[in-house]
Amino acid sequence: MSRGIIIIGSGFAARQLVKNIRKQDAHVPLTLIAADSMDEYNKPDLSHVISQSQRADDLTRQLAGEFAEQFNLRLFPHTWVADIDADAHVVKSQDKQWQYDKLVLATGATAFVPPITGRELMLTLNSQQEYRACETQLRDAQRVLIIGGGLIGSELAMDFCRAGKTVTLMDNAASLLASLMPPEVSSRLQHHLTDMGVHLLLKSQLQKLEKTEAGIRATLVSQHSIEVDAVIAATGLRPETALARRAGVAVNRGVCVDSYLQTSHPDIYAIGDCAEINGQVLPFLQPIQLSAMYLAKNLLGGNAPLKLPAMLVKVKTPELPLHLAGETQRRDLSWHITAESDGMIAKGMSGEGQLRAFVVSEDRMKEAFALLKTLSV
């Protein structure tokens, strides 16, 4: 490959791919282009920065220059890719262009901000850069409203509460983690957050935000209002597909790829939070790690389809941690729950008596790997 491989993006997926490529080929030309600084940080740490009194710069693990030297790369930080000419195999920015043999989109996902009046007052915590922009406001805020009771919203609510802040957690659903598991399973976390002092506003929808002398007034559709100092949107992520669309690559929820991580264009691939693999968006660390292993082989001439085993998803709520696996979101499962003082085991069984999903908490998490082996996939 005389022109080599170009990767657009610098997050976890891009870095894992670089490391796997270099394990197999030390010399193939590798170029990374990204809009950020390209410094490495651990994104899951963003769920704990407030209670641990960390500044944005504290999260940096490796500077971009060190990464480039370690893995023999060309890096172009703070560079916005404007267009891709897929037929000519050319990536274009405003003032540069690069030719490639293989191109990988690792453009990640952006935080969704509800389209309400005053949406510009909402903060997001989806990157080190976003945290850097609002860290002073979040440290100084005493009253915090978090919109969204999913994984990230629940993690942030616990973290801000542990930091001594007054926290309100709002969601349209009737329970936390509603897209992941039924209420009888998530209720243990829900009760624990309430006991910690988190105020839950479930079955509630935000209508507007207004700046006031005292802070921010959040008004619900019910016309109930609360005064807070900061509002965080944790309402999910949207895969970044705009660049793929401009390149003429097929997109749906994410950039559509097959089991080889290949898009509708034979020399363009996608990985990580932006990718939709055979109809599934999997924005979790383990599938990204496995995707990087397989994609590295395929970029270097292999023909290895990605095979994903049953995998654990970890909810990083330190005072009541959870692991889950399988089809926990299915509504037709029969849940068998054993809850004791040291933790919970919840098993989702099919009508045929097969274990299709499970959730474990606290000290019972040590049983997760044994359950994983018996999971029907």
Curated annotation (Swiss-Prot):
Keyword NAD among record annotations: yes
Read off the lineage from the record: Bacteria, Pseudomonadati, Pseudomonadota, Gammaproteobacteria, Enterobacterales
The pathway entry for this protein reads as: Nitrogen metabolism; nitric oxide reduction
Which molecular function term from Gene Ontology is one that the record holds?
Answer: oxidoreductase activity, acting on iron-sulfur proteins as donors, NAD or NADP as acceptor
The record's catalysed reaction(s) read: 2 reduced [nitric oxide reductase rubredoxin domain] + NAD(+) + H(+) = 2 oxidized [nitric oxide reductase rubredoxin domain] + NADH
Q: Which UniProt keywords apply?
A: Cytoplasm, FAD, Flavoprotein, NAD, Oxidoreductase
- Provide the function of this protein: One of at least two accessory proteins for anaerobic nitric oxide (NO) reductase. Reduces the rubredoxin moiety of NO reductase.
Any one annotated GO CC term: cytoplasm
Q: Which domain of life is it from?
A: Bacteria
Q: Which family does it belong to?
A: Belongs to the FAD-dependent oxidoreductase family.
Any idea what this protein is called? Nitric oxide reductase FlRd-NAD(+) reductase
Q: Which Pfam families match?
A: Pyr_redox_2 (PF07992), Rbx_binding (PF18113)
Q: Where in the cell is it found?
A: Cytoplasm
Named cofactor requirement(s): FAD
Stored InterPro entries = FAD-bd_OxRdtase, FAD/NAD-bd_sf, FAD/NAD-binding_dom, NO_rdtase_NorW, Rbx-bd
> What Enzyme Commission number(s) apply to this enzyme?
1.18.1.-
